[in-house]
């Protein structure tokens, strides 16, 4: 199908050579001189085209009949491509190059360059194009996940963010593996400080073989001794796209189905993409449930230990009797009782994770029931604590990010020990220590507790709640994006009201 460009729309204010120069900043943009002197060149995004189509149906016939090419129109009779656009505009080039076309440039002598667009779109890159988001499951919304091939992951991002401003910087990490690492960001939106920080830290890695993106995170972390994840690991495409559009940086690693999004904040690890696919009130409610679940999971066992060891006078009289009765035959102090049950829960969880899926689920359910019942009958623990620990384990599953869930489980143990040794004072000291540590943490140079500390008004409300889209037109100010607004809600409302009239 041959077409002349005849679209009448607002043109980009720049020349085609300048536009091509801008696109060359991305590592997945490729240029090829068919003729060595540069009179006939080919430009394309490797992540959107099929290399076999280019080699077999474009390059091979052109090289065989170079002498017959006098004008760009001669390409029509040479290549075996149906969809060709002659003399495209800059806007055509922007749209089509990002959609799987290649750009052919011809220059004869002192004549001005002429161009043609030829379709070479890739339909499938590799044997498996997308992965299922098993570890970040959502009931509503897309379930497209990354795979272990970084080129396919770049292709997925290109398909969802169709703009030449999406830039990919390719790096090589690992003295033995030469692992391909790609830093993705949106030019004109992402703050350059975040880009430079991520790039510099990746270049400074001196390691023989980084097997996974999570290893890369530990190398470029602001504090490698912190139990908290500094960058947000995600296998979800929509979550990575949102991070880029919001002014963040996404790091892709060849051989890993996970991307690293940053700068990340503590609140980011309790946000699920599903929040934005539900009505804002439902999304806000579920987010608050996650915050409560994380706090309950972290402190419930420690509070039980502190109250029964030092502060039993705080327990209401009606509740004190059942607690004394349930602990009447338990020979251990509350701190050992709590540690025993917490370790048992962790053993069941780890055993279930290492076994095949169906067997692991059975072990977790049956093992929990049998061991819990046997522990109560053997007077190793009380029924009250058994219920509290079971609810604590259940609450930990509400955290949508595996690494943050693991952090909460780890921190439970020192809090229980402090509560058993010093009571409520020890619990407060443990909380203050965690808070002080969080205040000092940074992600790619950005404070980890943002927008809670330093306080950021509407940004804080947006982190704690899922606000309506009409109130979230701006990008997160604490990321310091170059372009503040994602869209103008007032103009959108005016257009909608105009259509209704």
Cite the ranges covered by each PLM segment.
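Short capping/connector residues at structural and topological boundaries
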Residues: 34, 135, 144, 155, ...
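Generic detector of multi-pass transmembrane helix bundles and their immediately adjacent loops
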Residues: 303, 316-324, 331-501
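Membrane-embedded alpha-helical signal segments
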Residues: 1-299, 314-317, 438-501
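Interfacial segments of transmembrane alpha-helices in multi-pass membrane proteins
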Residues: 282-312, 328-330, 347-357
């Amino acid at each position: 199908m041959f077409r002349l460009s005849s679209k009448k729309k607002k043109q980009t204010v720049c020349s085609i050579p300048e536009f091509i120069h801008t696109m060359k900043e991305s590592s997945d943009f490729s240029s090829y001189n068919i003729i060595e002197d540069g009179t006939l060149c080919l430009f394309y995004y490797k992540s959107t085209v099929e290399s076999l189509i280019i080699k077999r149906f474009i390059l091979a016939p052109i090289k065989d009949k170079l002498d017959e090419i006098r004008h760009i129109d001669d390409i029509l009779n040479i290549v075996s491509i149906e969809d060709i656009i002659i003399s495209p505009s800059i806007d055509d080039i922007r749209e089509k190059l990002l959609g799987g076309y290649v750009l052919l440039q011809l220059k004869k002598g002192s004549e001005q360059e002429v161009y043609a667009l030829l379709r070479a779109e890739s339909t499938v890159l590799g044997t498996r194009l997308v992965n299922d988001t098993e570890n970040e499951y959502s009931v509503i919304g897309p379930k497209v996940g990354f795979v272990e091939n970084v080129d396919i992951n770049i292709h997925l991002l290109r398909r969802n963010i169709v703009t030449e401003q999406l830039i990919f910087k390719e790096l090589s990490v690992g003295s033995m593996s030469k692992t391909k690492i790609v830093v993705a960001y949106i030019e004109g939106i992402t703050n350059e400080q975040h880009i430079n920080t991520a790039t510099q830290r990746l270049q400074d890695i001196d390691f023989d073989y980084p097997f996974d993106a999570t290893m890369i995170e530990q190398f470029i972390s602001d504090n490698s001794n912190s139990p908290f994840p500094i960058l947000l690991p995600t296998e979800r495409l929509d979550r990575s796209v949102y991070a880029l559009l919001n002014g963040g940086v996404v790091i892709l690693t060849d051989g890993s189905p996970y991307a690293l999004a940053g700068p990340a904040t503590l609140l980011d690890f309790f946000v699920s993409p599903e929040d934005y696919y539900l009505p804002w009130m439902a999304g806000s409610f579920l987010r608050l449930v996650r915050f409560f679940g994380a706090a309950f999971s972290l402190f419930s066992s420690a509070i039980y230990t502190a109250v029964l060891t030092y502060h039993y006078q705080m327990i209401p009289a009606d509740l004190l009797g059942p607690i004394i009765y349930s602990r009447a035959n338990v020979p251990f102090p509350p701190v050992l009782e709590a540690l025993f049950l917490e370790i048992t829960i962790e053993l069941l969880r780890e055993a279930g994770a290492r076994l095949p899926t169906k067997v692991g689920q059975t072990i977790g359910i049956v093992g929990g029931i049998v061991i819990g019942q046997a522990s109560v009958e053997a007077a190793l623990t009380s029924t009250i604590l058994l219920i509290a620990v079971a609810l604590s384990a259940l609450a930990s599953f509400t955290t949508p990010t595996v690494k943050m869930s693991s952090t909460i489980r780890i921190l439970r143990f020192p809090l229980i020990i402090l509560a058993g040794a010093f009571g409520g004072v020890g619990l407060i000291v443990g909380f203050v220590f965690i808070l002080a540590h969080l205040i000092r943490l940074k992600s790619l140079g950005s404070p980890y507790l943002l927008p809670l500390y330093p306080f950021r008004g509407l940004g804080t409300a947006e982190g704690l709640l899922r606000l309506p889209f009409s109130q979230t037109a701006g990008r997160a100010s604490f990321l310091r994006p170059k372009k503040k607004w994602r869209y103008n809600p007032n103009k959108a409302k005016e257009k909608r009201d105009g259509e209704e009239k």
